[in-house]
Amino acid sequence: MAYTPEPFAASGDAVAVGQVVEIPYVWTDGVVYLHLENIGTAYTLTVNDSKVAEVEDPSTPAEFALTPYIREGKNAIALTLRRSAADRINAVPASRKAFENCYLYTQTKRSIRDFEIALVPDSTRKFGVLELAIVAQNGFNYDEPVTVGYDIYSPQGKLLEFNMQEVTIPGRSTDTVRFTPFIYGTNANKWEPGAKNPPLYKVMLFTRRDGAYREYMPLKIGFGKTELVDGRLTRFDKELKLVKAGYNAAADRKTTLAELKALKAKGNNTICPDYPQPGWFYDLCDELGLYVIDCANINAPEKRDDRKVGGTPSNDPSLVDEYLERVKAMYYRSRNHSCVIAFALGGESGNGYNMYKAYEWLKSVSYTHLRAH
């Protein structure tokens, strides 16, 4: 369901936009989310006059669980557009159509809330291992069994592996189901930059109930792992040379595809954006065989060499939560894309307490990606 808010009030530097959304009864028996991107400024989200969230980052897409705030019938979903309290660290976002790709969606109360996936070489380098973790959720108030599973097809279309598992989840909570099957023949389908058509495996995540499939989630992943060995960047045990180009997605997918192809034709194999990009940007890089060093929306060159507490935004403890929030948002959005080989904590920014805490967090959650600043 599209979310296309219109202005309805203004006060000082703030503008209120909103839309009255008709929520059908069937949605009230599920879990409802609002996806927001291309807002262009900081905002406060309210639903039926209840505050849901305050967001200072104008560039990174975000999702919000609205189930506690909505009801059957008409619902007023509003955004108060305002100046960011963290303007000092914002990169300048690309100009895109306001509120493009904002929408609401629903899932059943027994569904897939999140996942992590990678197809990497095993310890012998002879085969691949699918490292898959599915976070299943139970939106009911009581224990419920939830069955989740997957299948994986080779780039040539052959079914390679299929499995599912049932787990009983307490009410209003989640549980993680892990699968680690060997995938044979992967060395014939290496995902590497420079290839004309880099091979991608097709994976389908699903939930099942009473013998019927209830939810499908199609994915594409490439085989490989980028590692730092003795100070050398390697992939498939060969030293990797990155030819980098700074680039942010254009206003639309078609233009971005043409520009990425042009960058690749010039010999570039690594794209370095200034802040998190639209979801389809990473899809294009997966398909084209371009590495991406993703970047959090942190750009704080102000007094970057000042080592005093508060001397630079990166060493101002009052901003530590905002730094962490932005690094987390970057990581969770793009971590499952084969093209993403590293995460940058930000653009031109000084060092300090906030950067250190962000680095610590990123290191604690990801061992398959490199970290940069």
What are these regions (language model features)?
Residues 1-279, 283-287, 341-342, 361:
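Secreted/periplasmic carbohydrate-active enzymes, especially glycoside hydrolases
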